[in-house]
Amino acid sequence: MKHIPRKRFGQHFLSDSGIIDAIVRAIAPEPGQPMVEIGPGLAALTQPLVERLGRLTVVELDRDLAARLRQHGQLDVIESDVLKVDFAQVAQALNAPKIRVVGNLPYNISTPILFHLLAHVRVIADQHFMLQKEVIDRMVAAPATSAYGRLSVMLQWRYAMENVLFVPPESFDPPPRVDSAVVRMVPHEAPEALSMPVLEELVQVAFSQRRKLLRHTLGRWLEARQFAGTFDTQRRAEEVPVSEYVALAQKCS
């Protein structure tokens, strides 16, 4: 029986074999590597991955799809909302210090998923995700550009990222109304040590009114914390590079 894509899960299934091959080449799976796929759907990407890996763990929320996937002898199925999955526990279950994570992420919750994985980054070797191209543009954006924001700062602090493949809407069934792309995310080996909640709060405050100078937003936040250091608040949030936000978070941690 044909599976009808569910709008509430943001389901758009990959159907272009050329694009699927290109994604698998970008991921470059090796036999025996511990890998987790988020949102395997109809297994378009799952099958070529598991053929190369030998075994694959998948996270699927849709009950009907999870039941189908369980019939595959080489898949370990976690039927769950990915935002509730403890990836440290998954790595432990796979007896792996670090796991590779891949997926065609549901576009309606892609940012929460990225932040959830950020909290588990210590057990992640790398990530390859299909996302809305506009989201990837924000992830890799440079300072002083309109795409640069909270997502750019939080992810660039912890990952080296690159857009590795453009994916047009007609590669999916049903086609989304947006362009897509594949991003590669490799955690930095020696990231700057800081309190992630402090960086998150600091960046959220800074970009809360991005048109205003930081003295109206972040300046007040720093005053409330009795910050005694120096930081130029006569700038807009988008003008401050990641390294300066990180240094400020370290001083406030």
UniProtKB/Swiss-Prot annotation:
- In short, the EC number is 2.1.1.182
Keywords attached to this Swiss-Prot or TrEMBL record, sorted alphabetically, are: Cytoplasm, Methyltransferase, RNA-binding, rRNA processing, S-adenosyl-L-methionine, Transferase
Q: Which GO terms describe its molecular function?
A: 16S rRNA (adenine(1518)-N(6)/adenine(1519)-N(6))-dimethyltransferase activity; RNA binding
What catalytic reaction does the record list? Answer: adenosine(1518)/adenosine(1519) in 16S rRNA + 4 S-adenosyl-L-methionine = N(6)-dimethyladenosine(1518)/N(6)-dimethyladenosine(1519) in 16S rRNA + 4 S-adenosyl-L-homocysteine + 4 H(+)
Residues reported to bind S-adenosyl-L-methionine: H12, L14, G39, E60, D81, N104
- Give the subcellular location: Cytoplasm
Q: Name one GO cellular component term.
A: cytosol
InterPro entries the UniProt entry points to: KsgA/Erm, rRNA_Ade_diMease-like_C, rRNA_Ade_Mease_Trfase_CS, rRNA_Ade_methylase_Trfase_N, rRNA_adenine_dimethylase, SAM-dependent_MTases_sf
Pfam families attached to this UniProt entry:
RrnaAD
Q: Report the sequence similarity comment from the record.
A: Belongs to the class I-like SAM-binding methyltransferase superfamily. rRNA adenine N(6)-methyltransferase family. RsmA subfamily.
HAMAP family per UniProt: 16SrRNA_methyltr_A
Q: What does this protein do?
A: Specifically dimethylates two adjacent adenosines (A1518 and A1519) in the loop of a conserved hairpin near the 3'-end of 16S rRNA in the 30S particle. May play a critical role in biogenesis of 30S subunits.
Q: What is this protein called?
A: Ribosomal RNA small subunit methyltransferase A
Q: Which organism is it from?
A: Acidovorax ebreus (strain TPSY)
